[in-house]
């Protein structure tokens, strides 16, 4: 037992536990986030006796007499300062890390009123952010320090919130102060806690399950196995190949497969009971590598499949082999990229209960509430299900697949009680799909002037235990491997193999990040052969408006690759002139699904009784700022002011399905739907209707992005409605060999909110600095992956270089007011630019990631 103060109130503990659990589970101070419970991420940072501390580390018995402060304990003045500073800087995206960052800010400014940038970075060094790249968080601390010094908040600037305005996101306040709720922040009366027993082996047949001992444990209310599932057992994003629970006689596919579920009155009891479930297995040989998977006599990951091939793509235009044969210069090489973990700060969590309509209601953190609804309904065998997005603590593709939502819903269905199902960080690292490792052989031919004549490639990817989005990822990797250049002859073969490793699926860049590394590295090598700079070879080959891409699509006048090259040119040439090692990479990335797949955005605008216009869309806001984008769309296309607009989080009973938040599609696809809804609303206003007349009327619109299927028999297929383009430059410090600066120029069409665009660029760059230099997701020969968040190799605030984010504002696209999403492309060209910079420094080409022999390399 211990007695201490929390936010000025005396508290007394009844049992020894981690401070994090006491603050959240007993005091319900939910600004203190549980990101890892291993002392790594910093999301649970509080202040103890004036110093920051991760609340998941100390036991309460050791805190007798201490004074603890959480975000809930800030003064009214501090709340205003930090909300203003973090909003003004654009420092908030998903928001999960922000309360911890605010605590670090307060602890610093309480003792240092004028911190230097290095002191700010040092104060933030123990806290991870996966969204922002830290740049704007550092800016926020600097702004807060200035306001604290001056003792007064700046006067509000009358920002009109039109497209192009640098505005603070609409959800800044609730994320800075920790009042917004993620699923784990819900504590319901009578709530049970779920836990899963997962497979002991990557590939085995389940022979029997004995749950007797688990059921006998006091506090356990249910132990659920496959026979208890009322609907379909198998689910999956595109292909229903993943068991909800492995049945007796069923085959496990990886160590993350759930065998049974427990619902208990507390989490400790649920976890203990899961370990008491006894499972008899027939252990079978497993597949760990694609080489093993490709053997004719290999064990099959799926009983029902003919082989271990998940997807195969062959794309060809022109005659690549002949063009390469006739080229002046030809270069071939093998490239490899690794598994990568999304490392979003919020572990997966869902809370479910029966609502007053008798429906199973699920609070979810996902990238599509309607997809969650579909798969939960399949498992429960009923359409009496509702899904509501709570705040989503980052996704990057990793929350497109089901992980806990259907399990929580199933436990509620069985017990008739509220249930919280949350993955531990180790479970999260195991269960959700990762970035595919790619193995690529690529050949490029050029003429004497460096003009690309043809490219031929063969790639293979490990898609792990399930299909997930492996097929579309492979397809996008192949279609974009040609690069953003103007030439005709291109051929690529791609194969994705099943293994018994954790599944691979969507990840920021969607396969393009991997093939871009190979293509851009070959182009840098080709520049040396031709005798021109890597910048020049790109400028000569860059796709320009009304030219034809290697896939046959004629691009329009919104195409801005040349502008991105010209934007980085001054710093690129200055670095060369100064004798610095400098590398460069370009990229393009589709916005929207494309290739003939139906891609629809939908929006409802409704004046409610409060006389405010409410925005309803089934698109998930996962940190990219969709609610702010739609708000700016409305202000720009109507006479409605910002203060009269309310953005509602995605749900499945009012908000129309707008597809997944992926593929940089929501700004463009749902943004255009919103613009069309605005047109309908303004027709009524122009006809003389007042707000009172319009209350309850639904202004619904949708936008279907029409494209041609892959391989369509047309001369110039429209594969995608839009592409974003980018050029990034890496400059190394001549003394230390570390990155001095990344210059990142991105064509965003019309920038809806330049502040948010910069934040997306900075976050994507830092994510791929990690991809290029240090991040690892090792999987051992028994298909067991890393289990510690702190061992992933993520970059921290004090390690990031200067990032010059250049937003190229080039309208021209005829929909969504010219806006193109940039969430994915920001991370694509970084790695090849960094790799080329290190070649310029030491003359050693590196063909696999993370790069070896750099100052950032982790040994062992």
Q: Can you say where each PLM-predicted feature lies in the sequence?
A:
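Thiamine diphosphate
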Residues: 395-416, 420-421, 626-633
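Phosphate/diphosphate-binding loops
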Residues: 258-259, 264-266, 417-464, 671-691
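Short beta-strand elements
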Residues: 46, 174, 180, 184, ...
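Conserved beta-alpha junction segments in alpha/beta enzyme cores
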Residues: 320-379, 475, 585-612, 617, ...
């Amino acid at each position: 037992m211990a007695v201490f103060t929390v936010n000025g109130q005396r508290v007394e503990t009844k049992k020894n536990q981690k401070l994090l659990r006491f603050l959240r589970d007993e005091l319900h101070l939910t600004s203190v986030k549980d990101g890892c419970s291993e002392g790594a991420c910093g999301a649970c940072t509080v202040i103890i006796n004036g110093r920051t501390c991760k609340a998941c580390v100390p036991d309460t018995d050791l805190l007798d007499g201490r004074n603890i402060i959480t975000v809930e304990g800030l003064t009214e003045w501090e709340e205003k300062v930090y909300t203003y500073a973090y909003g003004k800087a654009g420092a908030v995206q998903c928001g999960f890390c922000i309360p911890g960052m605010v605590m670090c800010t307060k602890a610093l400014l309480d003792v240092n009123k004028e911190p230097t940038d290095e002191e700010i970075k040092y104060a933030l060094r123990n806290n991870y952010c996966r969204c922002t790249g830290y740049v704007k968080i550092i800016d926020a601390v600097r702004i807060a320090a200035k306001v604290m010094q001056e003792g007064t908040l700046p006067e509000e600037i009358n920002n009109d919130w039109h497209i192009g305005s640098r505005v603070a996101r609409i959800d800044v306040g609730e994320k800075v102060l920790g009042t917004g709720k993620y699923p784990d922040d819900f504590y319901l009366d009578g709530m049970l806690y779920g836990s899963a027993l997962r497979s002991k082996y990557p590939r085995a047949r389940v022979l029997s399950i004995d749950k007797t001992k688990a059921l006998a444990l006091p506090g356990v209310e249910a132990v659920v196995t496959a026979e208890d599932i009322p609907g379909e057992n198998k689910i999956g994003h595109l292909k229903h190949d993943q068991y909800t629970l492995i049945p007796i006689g069923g085959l496990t596919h990886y160590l993350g497969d759930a065998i049974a579920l427990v619902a208990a009155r507390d989490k400790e009891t649920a976890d203990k009971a899961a370990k008491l479930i006894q499972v008899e297995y027939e252990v079978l040989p497993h597949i760990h590598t694609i080489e093993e998977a490709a053997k004719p006599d290999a064990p099959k990951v799926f009983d029902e499949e003919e082989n271990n091939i998940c997807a195969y793509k062959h794309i060809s235009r022109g005659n690549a082999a002949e063009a390469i044969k006739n080229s002046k210069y030809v270069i071939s090489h093998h490239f490899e990229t690794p598994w990568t973990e999304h490392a979003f700060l919020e572990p997966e969590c869902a809370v479910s209960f029966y609502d007053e309509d008798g429906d199973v209601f699920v609070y979810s953190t996902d990238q599509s509430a309607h997809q969650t609804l579909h798969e939960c309904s399949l498992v429960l065998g009923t359409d009496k299900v509702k899904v509501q997005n709570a705040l989503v603590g980052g996704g990057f593709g990793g929350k497109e697949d089901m992980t806990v939502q259907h399990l929580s819903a199933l436990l509620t269905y069985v017990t008739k009680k509220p249930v919280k199902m949350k993955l531990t960080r180790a479970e999260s690292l195991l269960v959700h799909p990762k970035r595919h490792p790619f193995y690529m052989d690529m050949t490029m031919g050029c003429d004497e002037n460096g003009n690309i004549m043809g490219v031929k490639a063969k790639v293979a990817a490990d898609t792990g235990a399930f299909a997930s989005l492996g097929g579309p990822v492979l397809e996008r990797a192949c279609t974009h491997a040609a690069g953003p250049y103007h030439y005709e002859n291109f051929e690529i073969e791609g194969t994705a193999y099943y293994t018994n490793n954790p599944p691979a699926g969507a990840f920021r860049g969607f396969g393009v990040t991997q093939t871009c590394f190979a293509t851009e590295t070959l182009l840098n090598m080709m520049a040396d052969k031709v005798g021109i700079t890597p910048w020049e070879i790109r400028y000569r080959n860059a796709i320009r408006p009304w030219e034809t891409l290697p896939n046959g699509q004629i691009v329009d006048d919104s195409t801005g690759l040349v502008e991105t090259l010209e934007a980085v040119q001054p710093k690129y040439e200055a670095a060369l002139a100064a004798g610095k090692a400098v590398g460069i990479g370009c990229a393009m990335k589709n916005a929207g699904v494309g290739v003939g797949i139906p891609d629809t955005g939908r929006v409802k605008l409704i004046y409610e009784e409060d006389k405010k216009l409410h925005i309803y869309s089934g698109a998930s806001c996962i940190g990219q700022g969709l609610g702010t984008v739609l708000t700016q769309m409305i202000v720009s296309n109507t006479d409605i002011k910002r203060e009269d607009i309310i953005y509602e989080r995605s749900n499945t009973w009012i908000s129309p399905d707008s597809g997944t938040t992926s593929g940089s599609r929501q700004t463009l696809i749902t943004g255009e739907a919103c613009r069309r809804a605005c047109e309908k609303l303004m027709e009524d206003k122009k006809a003389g209707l007042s707000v009172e007349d319009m209350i309850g009327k639904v202004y619904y619109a949708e936008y279907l992005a029409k494209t041609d299927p892959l391989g369509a028999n047309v001369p110039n297929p429209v594969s995608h409605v839009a592409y974003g383009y980018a050029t990034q430059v890496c400059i190394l410090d001549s003394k230390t060999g570390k990155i001095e600066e990344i210059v990142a120029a991105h064509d965003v069409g019309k920038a809806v909110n330049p502040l948010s665009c910069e934040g997306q660029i900075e976050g994507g760059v830092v994510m791929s600095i990690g991809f290029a230099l240090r991040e690892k997701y090792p999987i051992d020969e028994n298909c067991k992956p890393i289990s510690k968040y702190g061992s992933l190799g993520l970059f921290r605030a004090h390690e990031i270089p200067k990032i010059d984010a250049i937003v190229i504002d080039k309208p021209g696209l005829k929909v969504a007011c010219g806006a193109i999403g940039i969430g994915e492309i920001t991370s694509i060209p970084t790695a090849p630019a960094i790799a080329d910079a290190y070649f310029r420094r030491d003359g050693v080409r590196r063909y696999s990631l993370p790069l070896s022999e750099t100052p950032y390399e982790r040994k062992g």
